[in-house]
């Protein structure tokens, strides 16, 4: 095999050599190889060349192909990093013909029937086989103990069906060599919500899933008011047909529901639900918070906020997200991703003269927007419903990575007033540049088809957007999708305040795509292609730490030693001796070199709130919480996130009794003792960072313990 090779990454006027871990991950995950394992991409430059060529081939004339090949290659060399599926699979059809360039999908609505449950298992199996992550909502399934008339029996409930999807995902990902990713969402008003909260407590159960609750505004307000909360499930339309349904009965409430067919629906589009149980809202809230405090799940999706701010509010009802949560999507929805490496635009880093090159940044974002739009044409999605969705709306999610590293390079502390100002500005410029490109592309290539469609104004539409009534619209009027998108989307109304003329033209012409931005966690592309710049919107976890990575053929995760990009850059450009926590005065880092543990949960939320103003989809972000953080204060983080208009909130508190994280500090490992029982019954205790010989391999004690406990040992 050709030896792996990466050039250095530019850092100011000099270059920062790639670390071994970055080179290794590129070679294992993103470098194109033949089925025999021979490298097709000799260098990273050849990887970028392959991607640029594949995406420029979408253009319609030889002259355009040549022009945009050159520009795409320039953007890739100046901070544009497409998501992993694009880097891996674009231009790779000769070697991987059945793979997709799409990271994010959501299943079609899982209807409450055995036929549809199993149909969706089949569809999701094909989706995972293509390399995509997938999300589902499972609260559409009737609660445990519900009568199934066709079978003359009682259902085992949603959790048991989730087990089927979990086993399918594990089997498909084991066969395909790439671990599958799934998200399960669940309504906070479903009668089985307590079971969902505890679903992963059993070792090894549902480990192919992330879990998130769909938290409604009504529920949060009930918690704040110390009120009651009704758990309910939709009433079948058959009751109305039989004349046994009473809309005014005390046990009937009306709720937004993803599926209308087969249920009783009022004029506002709400579904009749029968209450099965009433609980104190704070009791349910405390149960959610306790689980999140100890187990980091379930996640917290403010679903009413998601739908209120959805650009496609007029034609979608979102109930699920991709596995990492940065893309709330409709049934069969898909979204491709890309991130701009912010560290590439810092000039004169670590000096008083440090500044951000806005012109170069905006040029990269503009070119990258066209590049990502071209990915739609080579999406490789396996299902016709997915193809129709992505071609009709042309969603993509551009975000950034390296925010924490960039702030450090500019001398700002993450969470400070200066950092909040920069976060809003860098996100706003990404958004406005993207929407200007959306208009230019629509004029050149045509808008997203959904925005050319005519829509009939309904009572539900006027209920959601009362300003339409003030503008003279009435039920039955016909209005273009481009108008509903550009004029009445809550997000696009903010764009209009920045640039009224742009919004007016988007309403008239239509945008090339309905959505432009989201911020992904970017774990492996940050580590590899960005030389371990901080993930997504996050600060650096630490400046020198261990990362647990899956290795093909290895029976547990491997602990890899890594350095933050800003530390590498500082050592290369300023002080070669510098190291974190050094007692040597000549080796100490500046005080603005902070990490995730130095940042309060409130500061995490504040940063996310500044970015969310200009991100039209969502943001994957984790607020790190100290192990000893008081539970009552922990609960306040989530209320604060709600008050700050976030679409979701995720926290992580180190708890070695429950799981081993992807990112691990050496001090945490050293301070944690793991107990193993040998075949002869003898018990041994070892520190988490100690190495153990087991089954012919060397493992860190923490990773071996986790693999054995969770049941994935030897199955990667």
Stretches with model-predicted labels:
Residues 1-101, 248-272, 285-292, 635, ...:
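Acidic/polar, glycine-rich intrinsically disordered N-terminal extensions of enzymes
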Residues 3-17, 102-358, 381-389, 434-476, ...:
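Active-site cavity-forming subdomains of large catalytic enzyme subunits
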Residues 18-26, 73-94, 188-189, 369-378, ...:
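Core structural elements
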Residues 22, 326-328, 372-377, 447, ...:
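Catalytic alpha/beta core of large soluble enzyme barrels
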Residues 45, 49, 417-432:
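Short secondary-structure subsegments characteristic of cysteine-rich extracellular domains
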Residues 87-92, 358, 382-393, 406, ...:
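Active-site-adjacent structural elements in folded domains
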Residues 130-142, 179-184, 410-418, 618-621, ...:
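Glycine-rich phosphate/pyrophosphate-binding loops
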Residues 334-398, 408, 582-588:
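Long, charged, mostly alpha-helical binding arms that flank functional sites
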């Amino acid at each position: 095999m050709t030896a792996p090779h990466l050039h250095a990454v530019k850092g100011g006027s000099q270059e920062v050599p790639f670390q071994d871990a970055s080179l290794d991950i590129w070679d294992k995950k993103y470098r194109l190889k033949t089925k025999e394992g021979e490298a097709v991409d000799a260098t990273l430059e050849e990887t970028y060349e392959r991607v640029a060529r594949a995406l420029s081939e979408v253009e319609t004339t030889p002259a355009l192909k040549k022009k945009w090949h050159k520009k795409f290659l320039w953007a890739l060399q100046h901070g544009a990093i497409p998501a992993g599926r694009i880097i891996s699979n674009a231009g790779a059809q000769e070697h991987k013909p059945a793979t997709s360039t799409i990271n994010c999908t959501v299943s079609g609505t899982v209807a409450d029937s055995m036929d549809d449950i199993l149909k969706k298992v089949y569809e999701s199996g094909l989706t995972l086989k293509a390399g995509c992550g997938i999300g589902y909502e499972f609260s559409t399934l009737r609660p445990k103990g519900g009568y199934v008339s066709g079978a003359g029996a009682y259902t085992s409930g949603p959790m048991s069906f989730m087990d089927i999807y979990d086993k399918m995902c594990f089997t498909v990902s084991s066969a395909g060599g790439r671990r599958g990713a799934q998200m399960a969402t669940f309504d906070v008003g479903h009668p089985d919500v307590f079971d969902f909260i505890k679903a992963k407590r059993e070792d090894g159960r549902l480990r192919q899933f992330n879990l998130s609750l769909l938290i409604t505004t009504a529920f949060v307000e009930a918690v704040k008011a110390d009120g009651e909360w009704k758990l309910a499930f939709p009433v079948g339309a058959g009751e109305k047909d039989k004349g046994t349904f009473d809309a005014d009965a005390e046990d009937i409430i009306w709720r937004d529901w993803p599926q209308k067919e087969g249920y009783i629906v009022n004029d506002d589009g709400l579904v009749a639900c029968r209450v099965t149980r009433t609980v104190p809202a704070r009791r349910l809230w405390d149960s959610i918070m306790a689980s999140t405090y100890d187990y980091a799940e379930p996640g917290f999706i403010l679903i009413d906020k998601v739908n209120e701010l959805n650009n496609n509010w007029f034609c979608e009802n979102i109930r699920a997200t991709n596995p990492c949560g940065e893309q709330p999507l409709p049934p069969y929805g898909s979204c491709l991703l890309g991130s701009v490496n912010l560290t590439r635009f810092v000039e004169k880093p670590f000096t008083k003269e440090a500044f951000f090159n806005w012109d170069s940044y905006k040029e990269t974002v503009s070119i990258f927007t066209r590049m990502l739009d071209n990915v739609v044409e080579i999406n490789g999605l396996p299902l016709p419903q997915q193809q129709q969705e992505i071609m009709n709306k042309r969603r993509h999610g551009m975000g950034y990575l390296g925010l924490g590293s960039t702030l450090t390079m500019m001398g700002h502390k993450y969470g400070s007033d200066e950092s909040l100002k920069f976060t809003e500005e860098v996100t706003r410029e990404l958004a406005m540049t993207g929407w200007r490109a959306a208009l230019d592309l629509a004029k050149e290539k045509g808008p997203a088809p959904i925005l050319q469609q005519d829509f009939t104004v309904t009572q539900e539409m006027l209920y959601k957007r009362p300003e339409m009534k003030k503008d003279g619209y009435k039920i039955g009027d016909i209005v273009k999708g481009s108008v509903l998108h550009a004029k009445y989307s809550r997000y696009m109304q903010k764009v209009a305040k920045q640039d009224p003329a742009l919004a007016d033209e988007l309403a008239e012409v239509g945008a090339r795509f309905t959505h432009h931005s989201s911020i992904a966690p970017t774990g492996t592309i940050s580590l590899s292609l960005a030389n371990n710049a901080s993930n997504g919107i996050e600060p650096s976890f630490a400046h020198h730490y261990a990362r647990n990575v899956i290795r093909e053929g290895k029976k547990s995760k491997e602990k890899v030693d890594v350095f933050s990009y800003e530390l590498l850059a500082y050592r290369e450009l300023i002080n070669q001796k510098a190291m974190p926590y050094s007692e040597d005065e000549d080796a100490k880092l500046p005080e603005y070199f902070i990490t995730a543990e130095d940042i309060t949960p409130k500061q995490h939320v504040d940063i996310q709130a500044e970015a969310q103003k200009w991100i039209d989809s969502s943001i994957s972000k984790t607020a790190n919480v100290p192990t000893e953080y008081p539970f009552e204060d922990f609960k306040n983080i989530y209320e604060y996130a709600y008050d700050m208009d976030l679409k979701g909130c995720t926290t992580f508190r180190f708890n070695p009794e429950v799981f081993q994280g992807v990112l691990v500090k050496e001090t945490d490992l050293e301070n944690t003792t793991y107990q193993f029982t040998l075949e002869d019954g003898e018990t041994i205790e070892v520190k988490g960072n100690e190495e153990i010989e087991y089954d012919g391999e060397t493992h860190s004690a923490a990773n071996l313990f986790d693999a054995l406990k969770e049941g994935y040992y030897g199955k990667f």
